Design a protein with these regions (language model features):
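Secreted/periplasmic carbohydrate-active enzymes, especially glycoside hydrolases
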Residues: 1-199, 204, 208-212, 240-243, ...
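Substrate-binding/catalytic cleft of secreted carbohydrate-active enzymes
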Residues: 179-180, 189-320
């Protein structure tokens, strides 16, 4: 099956005349097993888990680009062999002529339909849909924000995850109503605060034509309140930031990531930091590699932590 948030669709070489879409898909083959320690591959047709023989599966991945009217406008087909435990990473490309570009005034949406089939039997094993939009953007020192080659003034607001008297539980129509009111007053940009937003909000921003700054943390290691996220930051920040980027990176509305809201570390002098060198290396090495980031006489722990989080984002999404 396609892994959770297992597709990553990017548009390259985009113009009004053509676009090249790159589709990265992560496939998984899940089996029930006691342990993952005794894995032995035999002759290329099966693997052995604790003496249990599990056959490998040859699959065909068909990725179809579907326009807003339901017409298939591009397709790519690839084959792979799936093995338990180890995901298969596939990369495909689709060339599209005369694409409809996503913009604030005309938020045109495509979707990628990923159809995974058993190569031998033709059985459909999974069908996965990824909404996507095709656009380019950049920042210019003189002109500001440029979307699809045109200057756009960002009229943005900070939108907290609540719905007034309705509370924080997600109500899609209530969110849509909020956005409709904001649209009427001339708003075209949303800053999520100060935590991963509801997917329903991002879907609506895609369809209604808002640009979004997607935000993760309200605090890092240093607490603002007694029971806030700082209690869990060291253990969970890598997983939580990774999940946010991988979950949300296909949304055309997102043009910027935020890795922290008014985090106390940005005002802390290096001498005032209480993290030991050993603790710093545990926190700062993404993936816990042997390479040491924090060293005596270099940047403060806070500067290194900022760099680490920014590097994580760029590694997971190089398009923003």
């Amino acid at each position: 099956h396609v892994a959770q948030w297992g597709t990553y669709v990017t548009a390259e070489e985009v113009s009004k005349n053509s676009a090249r879409l790159k589709i990265r898909t992560s496939l998984q083959y899940d089996v029930e097993m006691q342990t993952e320690d005794s894995v032995q591959q035999a002759d290329g047709t099966y693997v052995v888990f604790d003496s249990e023989i599990i056959p490998l599966i040859d699959v065909v991945l068909q990725s179809r680009l579907v326009d807003a009217d339901g017409h298939v406008v591009g397709e790519a087909v690839s084959e792979a062999q799936l093995m338990p435990v180890a995901p298969a990473e596939m990369e495909q490309e689709i060339e599209l002529k005369n694409p409809n570009l996503w913009s604030i005034d005309a938020p045109y949406m495509y979707k990628v339909e990923s159809i995974l089939k058993n190569k031998e039997t033709g059985e459909v094993l999974d069908r996965y849909y990824t909404p996507t939009g095709i656009r380019t953007f950049r920042f210019d020192a003189q002109k500001g924000f440029i979307l699809n080659g045109e200057q756009v003034k960002i009229n943005g607001v900070c939108m907290h995850h609540d719905l007034g008297c309705l509370g924080a539980a997600v109500n899609t129509r209530a969110i849509e109503r909020q956005l409709e009111i904001l649209k009427e007053m001339g708003c075209n940009g949303i800053r999520c605060s100060h935590n991963p937003p509801a997917p329903e909000l991002l879907d609506l921003c895609d369809r209604m034509g808002f640009i979004v700054m997607d935000e993760t943390f309200d605090m890092w290691r240093k607490k603002k309140t007694r029971h806030d996220y700082s209690r869990y930051f060291n253990e969970w920040h890598e997983r939580d930031l990774t999940d946010l980027i991988v979950r949300d990176r296909n949304h055309p509305s997102i043009f910027m990531w935020s890795i922290g809201n008014e985090v106390l570390e940005q005002w802390t002098d290096a001498k005032a930091d209480t993290l030991s060198l050993a603790e710093a290396n545990l926190v700062l090495n993404f993936g816990h590699s042997a390479d040491m980031l924090a060293k005596d006489g270099e940047m403060s722990v806070n500067s290194l932590l900022t760099k680490k989080l920014a590097d994580m984002v760029r590694k997971l999404d190089a398009t923003r």
